[in-house]
Amino acid sequence: MTLTNLDVIVVGAGFSGILAVYRLRKLGFRVQGFERQERLGGVWRENAYPGAAVDSLFPFYQFYDAELLQDWEWVEQFPTRAEMLRYFDHVDKRWEISASFEFGVSVSAARYSETTQRWTVSLEDGRRAEARWFIPAVGFSSVLNIPRIPGMSRFRGPIYHTAKWPHDAVSMRGKRVAVIGTGPSGVQIIQSVGKIAKAMTIFQQSPCLTLRKYGSPSQTATALCMRPDDHREALRLGLQTSNGFGYVPRDQDTLDVPIEERNHFYQQRYLAGGWAFWMAGFRDLCQNIQANRDAYDFWARRTRARISDVAKRELLVPQIPSFAFGIKRPCLEEDLYEVMDQPHVKVIDISNQQIELITETGIRVHGQTVECEAIILATGFGDEASGLRSLHIRGRNGIRLEDAWSDGVESHLGMAIHSFPNMVILYGPQCPTLLVNSPAVITVQVEWLCEIIARCQQAGICQLEATSKSHCQWERKMSLLWDKTLYHTHARKSKKTAEANKEEKTWVGGLILYRRELENCLANNLEGFQAWHVEETGLL
């Protein structure tokens, strides 16, 4: 069976997929969405681990649509998974978006036909769907990063990945628990499970640089975040600040400010909680290594004072940082270091000597076995392109996406790829995923997507494809910004990019400049694209 009466196919029902379906449907396009989960919510539907919560304040992490505010009120300043699912249910009630999705079905392949100028999407249940446009909206949190550790199948107890946590109740109370990974989910797991476990052993690859969710125990708000009481104003601000969270950096370089004034400023930002210390700090935080070290030293002094165990203090908050502060998105914590400082919690450094194997009863490292009853993999997801690769996409002449990206990711605007006509990626590689509020990025991308598809329909364009030249131009624009920052000092390299001596760069110019690039493309007659009209192809 093949569904053929479609204009657009959208894969994924997280923020980007939901918004794309809603906006395109409002424009009158025939849209069909597919989602492997049973309901809306994307990563929030899957991430059921203890402590799962949003790491940004409530006015900004939502759809930028004032209509949704009419009968909705956020209860939590940093919404938990439960509140996020309640929010998606509210969105569904308002927008009736589930009517345009099929749930519980996975996409096994997607292929473009030059003969018909249409995409065919194959589903795992054997059905197919065809449409002019194909919109993968799977983000970069859809493919799990499972470490390859010998002996995993031998372990007698349960092994949980945070993104595949059982939705049924799982109790860690009174158990000996091992946690591998100290990224965002690791931080939340450690805070939640560490308080009730009999023993917890944390395997740390590198120290996790965190910021206090609340600047002090008595605080419940971030005073220095531009967070107006009027949520509509907050939504406007979210699209008019570079980070999408309303934070504005101080318009001074760090070392131009006297040390006493500097430390007073750091103290203000630190006590504000949230990401104020990072996003509302001095403007050269992630550009000047001396400025960056100055900020790190202040943070380290405050954080080290919370850890009484000397050995743990050096592991968790070293005096010399492993990487520049803020080039990785800081995790937010409430009492992480107090939990890790407890005697029943052990921290093992695996930066130089990896885990050897998993036995029936524990984890062997440094020649010794750590006994445990449950293992938690807080190891996150694959690289930003892993979700797209999992869809087995083939473009013009049957070229596989994996082959097109054999030397690393290439794109135009982080949304389109040469040899893959009529395919627009939402919230994928090479767009502002690192430093910007994701719903804000998605909002401007979907606005651009809708304008592109509407223009093509009006102009009789049946095929729109990014040029190979546009890849080079986008790479050059990214590099001009990237090379001025400290991000290149700790750039991640996949095996393929390492072989090609390329860094996995992303857009670090923020939301305002990115939106300008999208607008320039539209204003300059779809710059960077080649278009074929219906009369040129013979398709009527």
UniProtKB/Swiss-Prot annotation:
Practical and industrial applications: Loline alkaloids show broad-spectrum anti-insect activity, and different lolines may have different biological activities. In vitro tests of NFL, NAL, NML, and semisynthetic loline derivatives with long carbon-chain acylations on the 1-amine have shown that many are effective against both fall armyworm larvae and European corn borer larvae, but the effects seem to differ depending on the modifications. N-Formylloline reduces the weight gain of fall armyworms by deterring feeding, and does not significantly affect corn borers.
Cofactor binding note from Swiss-Prot or TrEMBL: Binds 1 FAD per subunit.
Biological processes annotated in GO: alkaloid metabolic process
Inducing or repressing factors: Expression is induced in loline alkaloid-producing cultures as well as in planta.
Single Gene Ontology MF annotation: NADP binding
Keywords, in A-Z order: Alkaloid metabolism, FAD, Flavoprotein, Monooxygenase, NADP, Oxidoreductase
Pathway(s) served: Alkaloid biosynthesis
Pfam families to which the protein is assigned, alphabetical: FMO-like (PF00743)
The keyword Mitochondrion belongs to this UniProt entry's keyword annotation: no
Family of the protein in this entry: Belongs to the FAD-binding monooxygenase family.
Protein name (record): FAD-binding monooxygenase lolF1
Primary gene name: lolF1
